[in-house]
């Protein structure tokens, strides 16, 4: 009898264990909250392959790390995307302290969201942002071969590899002669042995790595890369880019037709906060008398032909990060000014030199390359010197003739500063029989206004029609579901910098009504936007003027009723549901009741 009871007890324990194991398996594999990222791609080495509709890969928490398994052969599947290839806004959601550290260190070292970059992996689809006419264009079969030169210093490993793989994935093999990576004496460990190992195991022999023994800066680093190149055309890219469909052929065709033509792609925008790839408007390069590059609208005369917005057009200057140039012409024209340091001003110098010395500079709308636009440069010069001022002085004294006084009118403190020996560059200008800077202003950039007693005022060339307001998707009260309290201004909703708190709802009070628009902004009483500090995630959210740039004012309602802030990767939380003060803060997203919000119509 006792033996039978013992057997029943054992069978019961076994049955219970199996039942719980099955339930836990179902929970952790299929519940939305346990997955955390229903739309997160798993990092891998294979190119993008869309999954069947409504089937998504599970999120691998290993991919939260810096790049813990880049060579272990994850399956490489990506999320099933919409037609515009937007990423899930929750890709940057923070679930634990490790996530928080990766994000914070990433912004500190790289000035963009490293957490998302690592989760994104090395391959992804990007939206085809070209004009519809571009897809119908054909190009000669005998285009010149390209050497892609990518100089990097302390770049994020995942961003660098995504740049390289985007080139390999979207460039015809017969046009890609080589990719030359120039490591400008980086200090990060993963850019040493890890990069060597990854290249050896996963990359084509066309990808070559050159390491500088000391910090040279972008300018001289590119010259090092060009000296190692053997392709017909040099294509310079920054180390945090992603090339688009058919990006190279439109750049090579004008160079084949005229080797003295220098071409630039349209630079699309990759958000530093979300890494979402979006189309950039068709604009051209200019500059101001402070010798800073700026974007200008394109005169209609440049786009009046039958090809419209798909036709290449002249640009007075280039942004400098991305361009293509015949290799022999690059050397004949004097490469870069090696007396310039690190970064800054070299793009204007080479732009002036191209135009003044017999070449032409075009922007090609059918070539699109995405670029992470950071809000600051995460590194400086080795000695803390003002390299922009040093380089601008060399540029002004070599190329601008009497118009350098326009620069000194804005920077009088630099008039007597040393800028090094420029005799070699002046000799180059004489040898190339270059035109005057006045010729450049008269013929290439007549819109540039000159100040001084004899200057004539000019009417504005371009009209600014203003920004279109984002479409409102929903209006209502923002209610914390645990307490049924409404999120309102602590003071008046027009007070910039004011806090928000959870208070009793008053359905007769219009100042409690939020608007949620297509830019993912939350606007209280049609006045100010809910905003978070991008650098201090411990600060509470505040009401600030709407800036329309996403990031700190971009909020997403998750499927589990969490309100996720894209820029900081955290969720809005009611600090103490029992307190009448109603303070709110940002916290690691855990799906708890205090993090559940509802925008009630």
Swiss-Prot record:
Chain segments annotated as transmembrane: 8-28
Disulphide bridges: 486-505, 529-546, 571-589
GO molecular function, one term: polypeptide N-acetylgalactosaminyltransferase activity
Superkingdom of this protein's organism: Eukaryota
Entry keyword annotation includes Nucleotide-binding: no
Pathway: Protein modification; protein glycosylation
Region span, Catalytic subdomain A: 143-254
Cytoplasmic compartment segments: 1-7
UniProt-listed Enzyme Commission number(s): 2.4.1.41
Membrane topology, record value: Single-pass type II membrane protein
Disruption phenotype: Aberrant left-right patterning resulting in abnormal cardiac loops, including leftward and symmetric/midline loops.
Keyword Disulfide bond: yes
CDD domains noted in UniProt: beta-trefoil_Ricin_GALNT11 (cd23440), pp-GalNAc-T (cd02510)
Glycosylated residues in this chain: 29, 202, 508
Cofactor list: Mn(2+); Ca(2+)
InterPro entries: GalNAc-T, Glyco_trans_2-like, Nucleotide-diphossugar_trans, Ricin_B-like_lectins, Ricin_B_lectin
Localization: Golgi apparatus membrane
Catalytic reaction list: L-seryl-[protein] + UDP-N-acetyl-alpha-D-galactosamine = a 3-O-[N-acetyl-alpha-D-galactosaminyl]-L-seryl-[protein] + UDP + H(+); L-threonyl-[protein] + UDP-N-acetyl-alpha-D-galactosamine = a 3-O-[N-acetyl-alpha-D-galactosaminyl]-L-threonyl-[protein] + UDP + H(+)
Region annotation (Catalytic subdomain B) ranges: 312-374
Residues in Ricin B-type lectin domain copies: 469-600
Keyword terms: Calcium, Disulfide bond, Glycoprotein, Glycosyltransferase, Golgi apparatus, Lectin, Manganese, Membrane, Notch signaling pathway, Signal-anchor, Transferase, Transmembrane, Transmembrane helix
GO CC aspect terms: Golgi membrane
GO biological process: cilium assembly; determination of left/right symmetry; Notch receptor processing; Notch signaling involved in heart development; protein O-linked glycosylation via threonine; regulation of Notch signaling pathway
PANTHER family: N-ACETYLGALACTOSAMINYLTRANSFERASE, POLYPEPTIDE N-ACETYLGALACTOSAMINYLTRANSFERASE
Comment on protein domains: There are two conserved domains in the glycosyltransferase region: the N-terminal domain (domain A, also called GT1 motif), which is probably involved in manganese coordination and substrate binding and the C-terminal domain (domain B, also called Gal/GalNAc-T motif), which is probably involved in catalytic reaction and UDP-Gal binding. The ricin B-type lectin domain binds to GalNAc and contributes to the glycopeptide specificity.
Protein name from the UniProt record: Polypeptide N-acetylgalactosaminyltransferase 11
Organism: Xenopus tropicalis
């Amino acid at each position: 009898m006792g033996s039978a009871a013992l057997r029943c007890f054992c069978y019961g324990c076994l049955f219970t264990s199996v039942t719980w194991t099955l339930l836990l398996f179902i929970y952790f594999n299929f519940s939305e909250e346990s997955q955390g990222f229903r739309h997160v791609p798993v990092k891998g080495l294979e190119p993008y392959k869309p999954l069947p509709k409504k089937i998504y890969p599970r999120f691998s928490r290993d991919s939260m790390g810096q790049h813990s398994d880049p060579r272990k052969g994850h399956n490489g599947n990506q999320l099933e995307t919409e037609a515009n290839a937007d990423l899930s806004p929750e890709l940057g959601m923070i679930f634990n302290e490790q996530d928080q550290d990766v994000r914070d260190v990433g912004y500190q070292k790289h000035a963009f969201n490293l957490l998302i970059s690592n989760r994104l992996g090395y391959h992804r689809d990007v939206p085809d942002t070209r004009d519809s006419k571009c897809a119908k264009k054909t190009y000669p079969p005998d285009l010149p071969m390209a050497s892609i030169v990518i100089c990097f210093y302390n770049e994020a490993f995942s961003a660098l590899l995504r740049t390289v793989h985007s080139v390999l994935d979207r460039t015809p093999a017969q046009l890609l002669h080589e990719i030359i990576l120039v490591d400008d004496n980086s200090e990060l460990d993963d850019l040493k042995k890890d990069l060597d190992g990854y290249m050896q195991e996963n990359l084509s022999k066309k990808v070559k790595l050159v390491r500088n023994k000391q910090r040279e800066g972008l300018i001289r680093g590119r010259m090092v890369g060009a000296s190692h190149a053997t392709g017909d055309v040099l294509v310079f890219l920054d180390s945090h880019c992603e090339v688009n469909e058919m990006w190279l052929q439109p750049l090579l065709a004008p160079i084949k037709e005229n080797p003295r033509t220098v071409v630039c792609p349209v630079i699309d925008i990759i958000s530093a906060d979300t890494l979402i790839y979006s189309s950039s408007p068709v604009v051209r390069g200019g500059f101001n008398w402070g010798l800073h590059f700026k974007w200008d609208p394109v005169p209609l005369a440049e786009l009046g032909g039958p090809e419209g917005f798909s036709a290449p057009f002249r640009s007075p200057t280039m942004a400098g990060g991305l361009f293509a140039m015949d290799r022999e012409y690059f050397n004949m024209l004097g490469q870069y000014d090696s007396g310039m340091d690190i970064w800054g001003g070299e793009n204007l110098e080479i732009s002036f030199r191209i135009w003044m010395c017999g070449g032409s500079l075009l922007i090609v709308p059918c070539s699109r390359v995405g670029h992470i636009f950071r809000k600051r440069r995460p590194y400086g010069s080795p000695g803390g010197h003002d390299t922009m001022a040093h380089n601008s002085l060399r540029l002004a004294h070599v190329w601008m003739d009497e118009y350098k006084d326009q620069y000194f009118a804005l920077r009088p403190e630099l008039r007597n500063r040393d800028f090094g020996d420029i005799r070699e560059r002046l000799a180059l200008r004489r040898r190339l029989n270059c035109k005057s800077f006045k010729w450049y202003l008269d013929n290439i950039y007549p819109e540039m206004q000159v100040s001084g007693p004899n200057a004539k005022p000019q009417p504005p060339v371009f009209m600014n029609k203003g920004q279109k307001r984002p479409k409102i998707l929903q209006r209502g009260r923002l209610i914390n579901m645990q307490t049924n309290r409404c999120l309102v201004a602590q003071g008046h909703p027009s007070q910039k910098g004011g806090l928000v708190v959870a208070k009793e709802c008053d359905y007769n009070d219009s100042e409690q009504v939020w608007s949620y628009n297509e830019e993912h902004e939350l606007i209280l009483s049609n006045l100010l936007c809910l905003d978070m500090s991008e650098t201090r995630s411990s600060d509470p959210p505040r009401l600030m003027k709407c800036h329309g740039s996403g990031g700190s004012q971009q909020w997403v309602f998750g499927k589990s009723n969490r309100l996720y802030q894209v820029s900081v990767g955290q969720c809005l939380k009611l600090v103490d549901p029992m307190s009448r003060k109603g303070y709110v803060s940002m916290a690691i997203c855990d799906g708890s009741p205090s993090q559940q919000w509802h925008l009630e119509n």
